[in-house]
Regions:
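Residues at the starts of beta-strands that form the adenosine-phosphate
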Residues: 5, 28, 108, 135, ...
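Phosphate-coordination loops involved in phosphoryl transfer and adenosine-cofactor binding
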Residues: 2-5, 57, 82, 133
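Rossmann-like NAD(P)(H) cofactor-binding subdomain of soluble oxidoreductases
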Residues: 72-125
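Rossmann-like NAD(P)-binding element
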Residues: 52-86
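Interdomain hinge/lid region at the active-site interface
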Residues: 199-277
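NAD(P)+-binding Rossmann beta1-loop-alpha1 motif at the extreme N-terminus of oxidoreductases
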Residues: 1-51, 59
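Internal alpha-helical scaffold of NAD(P)-dependent oxidoreductase catalytic cores
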Residues: 128-216
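Short glycine-/small-residue-rich Rossmann-like dinucleotide-binding loops
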Residues: 64-66, 90, 114, 189
Length: 299
């Protein structure tokens, strides 16, 4: 199965990067966005034509916030925009539930999420190579057709990414830990810079810049993302809160020099234990992971 025509709905960083990657392989791409200036900017970059096609395209990619996936899909299917549909949102379960309930033809849709991005947003930050060698999760439902599954795999191949298949809920639980909660933690830390001692930011090293870099993301988009995965993110933050409370108590104990040695020893152990667990956790990011075979689509 080969994609010859593609529609991209939403010309931000991810949507425009998908369009640029497809254009690099000779695919005819049509662009649409509520923000006309974003469409024009993407078109100037060579991402495609700033209009929707007259005839149905092979695949439509919905690059809109998670809360908008289901209503936009219903609208596009009603007008017959494409033979198959996918999206690139970073939350899957919410849209999946709504699509199964409301979409004119859920069999033509498959959820998708390329795990790639930049701290900058908008079409001018887009890159055709953004997805190269990056995981791209697909979340087929019990109704997803072979055609929709196959076209999504074709798109992933065009973008140079690596397909992985997951259930929507498992995906959302995973990215709550690896993406959504870290973004909030980075925002909390960065926000303190505006409330800290005068000129404290001038003493910042590369470590703080690395820690807070992702806080530069589009706040409205990230609010939608976190809200769409609120329960899973709250669970992660609750566990962080428990660890943080233990460390705060330990630090106050260590700061009180009049405390006994036994109590100080326990507090020091709490602190060292957290640092050790953190170092071990970073190692998880360096561990090679075996590739997951892509199973046949549900039907």
């Amino acid at each position: 199965m080969t994609i010859r025509t593609l529609a991209v709905i939403g010309t931000g960083l991810i949507g425009t990067s998908v369009a640029l990657a497809a254009r690099a392989h000779g695919v005819s791409v049509y662009l649409s966005d509520r923000d006309e200036s974003a469409v024009r900017a993407a078109a100037v970059l060579g991402a495609g034509r700033p209009q929707l096609p007259r005839d149905p395209v092979d695949l439509a990619v919905l690059a809109v916030p998670p809360s908008q996936i289901a209503p936009v899909l219903s609208e596009l299917q009603a007008r017959g925009l494409a033979s198959s549909y996918t999206d690139v949102a970073s939350v899957k379960a919410l849209a999946e539930r709504e699509i199964l309930d409301t979409a004119p033809d859920p069999s033509r849709y498959i959820g998708g999420h390329p795990l790639a991005g930049r701290e900058r947003s908008g079409p001018l930050a887009a890159r055709a190579e953004l997805f190269r060698d990056r995981p791209w999760v697909l979340t087929p439902t019990r109704l997803t057709s072979r055609a929709a599954f196959g076209r999504a795999l074709d798109l992933i191949a065009l973008c140079g990414a690596v397909p992985r298949v997951m259930r929507a809920r498992a995906h959302d639980d995973a990215v709550a830990l690896t993406s959504h909660a870290p973004h909030l933690v980075a925002s909390l830390m960065a926000a303190r810079l505006r409330e800290g001692p005068v000129d404290a930011a001038r003493l910042a090293g590369q470590g703080l810049r690395d820690t807070t870099r992702i806080a530069r993301g589009d706040s409205r988009l990230w609010s939608d993302i976190v809200e769409s995965n609120a329960a899973a993110v709250a669970d992660i933050l609750t566990r962080l809160q428990e660890d943080l409370s233990s460390v705060v108590a330990a630090l106050y104990d260590l700061a009180d020099r009049e405390r006994g040695r036994e109590l100080s020893g326990k507090s020091r152990h709490t602190l060292v234990d957290l640092l050790d667990r953190g170092a071990a956790g970073v190692g998880e990011l360096d561990e090679p992971r075996p590739g997951q075979p892509v199973p046949c689509p549900p039907r």
